[in-house]
């Protein structure tokens, strides 16, 4: 896809404590590489990737491909940047929430991050995918998979164990998040929840596009 040749521009936000591997995960997704020497993110950074999204119909058939320009925003996890980070919550449509499988405190802080999202995101029930990162460091694991899955089930969100080092489940986690977002847009009658930054390449907002489609149900917020 060339510049501007897409159907939707969608922003995702990666968040979690400092050092959980947000930058490395996004870099692995966009570039297919692992860099162990990344310095701690200061403020906000982002990466981009073009993908084609195809929804499965109720009969199992694959729908028309939607060309998606993903902006993947990388946030600082340090407390001193928290006010800057939360300012970006409302403009994002989906959230990749990471913790470090070798750091129990980063897992315990997941509840705090979800509380922040419930307060500052576009609605109280935003689309979130939880990722336990650094699954390749099994001998250093401090968080049991059962614990993480139980927490994810409590909040009704998907859970993946990922590795930026070898790429395990990173594409699957982001594709799951995109699928949740696209399905939410399809079923919403009230389009006011959609952040203004979600635009079509022809200059129309996603709200303009969706208002032309058949209304299928209420928004899940």
UniProtKB/Swiss-Prot annotation:
Disulfide bonds join 123-188. It is an enzyme of class 3 (hydrolase). The modification Cysteine methyl ester is found at residue 221. The modification Phosphoserine is found at residue 2. Changing residue 19 to V: No binding of GTP and GDP. InterPro entries: P-loop_NTPase (IPR027417), Rab27a/b (IPR041837), Small_GTP-bd (IPR005225), Small_GTPase (IPR001806), Small_GTPase_Rab (IPR050305). It is found in: Membrane; Melanosome; Late endosome; Lysosome. Transmembrane segments: none annotated. A lipid is attached at residues 219, 221 (S-geranylgeranyl cysteine). GO terms for molecular function: G protein activity; GDP binding; GTP binding; GTPase activity; myosin V binding; protein domain specific binding. The modification N-acetylserine is found at residue 2. Small GTPase which cycles between active GTP-bound and inactive GDP-bound states. In its active state, binds to a variety of effector proteins to regulate homeostasis of late endocytic pathway, including endosomal positioning, maturation and secretion. Plays a role in cytotoxic granule exocytosis in lymphocytes. Required for both granule maturation and granule docking and priming at the immunologic synapse. Belongs to the small GTPase superfamily. Rab family. This is Ras-related protein Rab-27A. It comes from Rattus norvegicus.
